[in-house]
Amino acid sequence: MTARQTGAHALLGAAHALGARVCFANPGTTELALVSALDDVRGIRPVLGLFEGVCTGAADGYARVSGTPALTLLHLGPGLANGLANLHNARRAHSPIVNIIGDHASWHLRYDAPLTSDIETLARPMSGTVIRVNASAEIQGAIRQAFERSLAHPGSVATLIVPTDAMEAPAAEPASSDAAPAHRIPLAAVSHERIVEAARRIGRARAVLLLGADALSERGQRAASRIAAATGARVIMESYPAIVALGGDLPRLERLAYFPEDVRSQLGDDFVLVAGSRAPVSYFGYPGQPSELVAQNRLVLLSSPGEDSALALEQLAEQVTRSSNATRAPAPVTVPDEAQRASGFTPADVAEELVLQLPENAIVSLEGSSCGAPYLRRAHRARRHWVMTNTGGAIGQGIPCGLGAAIARPDSRVICLQSDGSAQYTVQALWTMAREALDVTLVICANHRYGILQTELRRAGVSLDGQASAHMTRLDAPRVDWVSLGRGYGVPGVRVQTAEEFRDALRASLHAPGPMLIECQLP
């Protein structure tokens, strides 16, 4: 370790003492003091991303799997701007992240150099907390505050802005290695009155239990299953959970539909008891469709994402099983009909083979509806595993989130089930996967089009034969060669065109170390 301890050393030393073990970084000149200090402060793994959105998405995936914050290190306002989309997704997932932004030296800011910007204003919409350090002496207190704020329930991004002169200045005091790691405080308990009211309502009418956050933990799912057995209620998970355990001996979960008319049909006139989720709203505003998809008089809030939803469901299960004289058959799981099966190799074939081969405790990072929807309809038949989805709708999350999950849990195989259009947003993550030798299988569902946009155009009555409509939603002129692209980033790959070829490629990938890309040529 260098004899001279700087503010950068103090920052990293304090972060390590608070529990930081990984830093996803795309540094620039203003962050070089931190880069240098990483050589001296042991215990924090530096992971280089070639694009800031890779770093922020990886920190999100790391947090979802581990429950603890990673550090991100970004360069000034423009670097932060490049990472904002995945910080938006992380905010929606309630992921704890400590997001460090280097700034110009404090004495240089007034000269308005080309990279100068209002970092606080850029950071605020995606951050639960924004803290600016003004001097080296403030660093240790600021990093502790950032950790504590990020871990406060339900979890958030804490952005810490540190000017380069504060990082380069001598440390006011050495970081204490004896400092206690930052931990999440226990979730807030749901009041007894709310439990009793939920039990009263669920005993009088047909009900749907809508689960999110920790209601989707094993405890939450099993308690919800007991409630369903006692009352005949249906159990539905939110459309895009941050992370959910599926398969094995866990209960089968219905998934909330996407389009508003499908949600209203799915829920019918049942009253909806919300645990760890939000009341259903339409993803977009559609003419003639309401934004709120369940009337207020049919909603009961059992718990919010910042409350102990699993415990609340267990307490509710005790209430309803005590008052119920007989077990009722749970309502059948409603599974949407799949579109008429196309000939040849289809998304259903991809989903089916994944279900058959997925190893125990695997992690699936899912982005895109082409293969995602058919997979989630079948996931209950797989071995027990975890699924992460795109919580905020900003595409380009799937591959970086899988990267972060692989670093958080190196003993689990990660599968990125990824649509080809959104994969291009953060394709640089492939390079980091190769460099870090991560056990990740990338299944690229290559239909060479923006399928969701084509669906939306059809719903609006717009023909896809129009020159602009076709030109703006097709990705086949030229087609992206995913195998060559992966090879260029250091990831071996194979292109498959039949279910049999996919079966063999998937088996080979799951039994080989390191990353591998499988390009599935789909209709």
Residue ranges and their predicted role:
Residues T2, A137, G276-G372, A468-H471, ...:
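Phosphate/pyrophosphate-binding active-site segments
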Residues T2-S324, V440-L442:
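N-terminal alpha/beta PP-like core and its mobile active-site loop of ThDP/TPP-dependent enzymes
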Residues A8-R21, N26-T30, L34-D39, P330-D411:
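Active-site diphosphate/adenylate-binding microenvironment
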Residues F51-E52, Y111-D112, R184-E197, L256-A257, ...:
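A general structural motif
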Residues T68, A205, A362, S412, ...:
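Surface-exposed loop/turn positions
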Residues G79, A105, D165-M167, D214-L216, ...:
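Short, glycine-/Ser/Thr-/acidic-enriched flexible segments
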Residues L87-N89, F147-E148, D262-R264, L354-Q357, ...:
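Short amphipathic alpha-helices and their capping/turn segments at secondary-structure boundaries
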Residues I100, H108-L115, A230, P374-P523:
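Thiamine diphosphate
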